[in-house]
Regions:
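Membrane-embedded alpha-helical bundles that constitute the cytochrome b-like, heme-associated redox core
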Residues: 1-139
């Protein structure tokens, strides 16, 4: 049960981190569009929260695999596995594309923004499938 508590807290924090990242990302976009200097703390905060999100989804992946193998002995009991792997992939793609954003790589920013838009729906789906998995464990 303690493992699922860690997972629940981690998922809540991951969703919160995503919200903060959306806010800081929109803020950076606003300052760029206005051609005005952004606050010096904004980009480091965005990167730091991004690193936290990557860490949280990797922790969630580990908990999911260990917990499912420990409880069932194998994986693939629900769509939650595919949803979780999709979220991990999107978060990693977002993180890698973020490191590539520069005037020399005009493809990186649209990839980063689009990935994060898709991630919104993936997080909603993985949250829903996760809720159904938790109900299985509680029954």
């Amino acid at each position: 049960l303690w493992l699922w508590k860690i997972a629940a807290w981690s998922m809540g924090l991951a969703v919160m981190a995503y919200g903060i990242l959306a806010g800081t990302g929109i803020g950076m976009s606003y300052f760029r569009a206005q051609k005005s200097p952004r606050p010096k703390w904004l980009r480091p905060l965005h990167y730091t929260i991004g690193i936290i999100l990557v860490s949280l989804v990797l922790l969630l992946l580990t908990i999911g695999i260990v917990g499912t193998l420990g409880h069932f002995g194998n994986l693939g009991h629900s769509p939650h596995l595919i949803a979780g792997i999709t979220v991990v992939g999107l978060v990693l793609l977002s993180a890698v594309s973020a490191t590539q954003i520069s005037p020399k790589r005009p493809w990186a920013r649209p990839l980063h923004v689009t990935t994060n838009a898709v991630l919104f729906f993936a997080l909603a789906y993985v949250s829903w499938t996760g809720w159904t998995v938790v109900q299985k464990y509680l029954n």
